[in-house]
Design a protein with these regions (language model features):
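Extended basic (Lys/Arg/His-rich) segments that typically form rRNA-contacting surfaces
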Residues: 1-237
């Protein structure tokens, strides 16, 4: 059964782990705080079923008067982030319940969502991988320009989403089917294969993979290869 809710943690850096075969794999480490169910939204009252979960700690002094009252009414400590997850039914959830990385106990692949590193204002060559203009032969002080931006008097405008220089990075991005290499429930750490967008301390949302494809993990692939190696070859006639 698919896990409908997710967790929000922060990226604390990269390291590497080793498979039983000795092969190393780069991993990104995500640190989670225990999430708490703050509020339940029902189809009868709100038009859809959802679970509101709070993540992270925040000082009471940084909250607005309305949010102070909200958390006091729910009889829970203030949370930095409130996130809604739509669910089919609310039977398994109750206000005040804590949720940790144990929800990914039987999960092999996850989808993550985080914000990319901001690069500031960038030209077309860096931002869109344009080739640029020629180094000589008629080109003067336009070597890194993006070239033509439109047509003629008709349509007489630059179309929206034209690739030009502008602000690069600092965008929300989703990566799918990221393999879980290891989980550490005692320290609330999740080790994900490869790199993910964002710098250290970037907020990362992790959910079970929606595509739910039948894909082998790298450890399973290595194990399969090792088994095939042990099968003796047929003697040549």
């Amino acid at each position: 059964m698919m896990i409908e809710i997710g967790l929000i943690g922060k990226k604390i850096g990269m390291t590497r782990e080793f498979y039983k075969s000795g092969q190393s794999v780069p991993v990104t480490v995500i640190k989670f705080d225990k999430g708490r169910v703050i509020h339940l939204l029902s189809k009868e009252k709100n038009g859809y079923n959802a679970v509101q979960i709070g993540f992270g700690k925040i000082k009471n002094s940084k909250l607005s008067k309305q949010m102070k009252g909200y958390f006091a009414k729910k009889n829970t400590e203030p949370k930095k982030i409130l996130k809604e997850f739509r669910v089919k039914n609310l039977e398994n959830f109750k206000e005040g319940n804590e949720i940790g990385i144990e929800i990914f106990k039987d999960t092999k692949f996850v989808d993550i969502r985080s914000k990319t590193i901001g690069k500031g204002f960038a030209g077309a060559m860096k931002r869109h991988n344009f080739a640029g203009l020629r180094a000589s032969h008629g080109v003067s002080i336009s070597h890194r320009a993006h070239g033509s931006t439109g047509q003629n008097q008709d349509p007489g405008k630059v179309f929206k989403n034209k690739k030009m220089a502008g602000h690069m990075g600092d965008k929300n991005r989703t990566m799918q089917n990221i393999e879980i290499i290891k989980s550490d429930p005692d320290n609330n750490l999740l080790y994900l294969k490869g790199s993910i967008p964002g710098s250290k301390n970037t907020q990362v949302e992790v959910k079970e993979s929606v595509k739910n494809i039948r894909k082998l993990t790298m450890a399973e692939k290595i194990e399969k290869i090792e088994k095939l190696k042990k099968i003796p070859e047929k003697k040549k006639k």
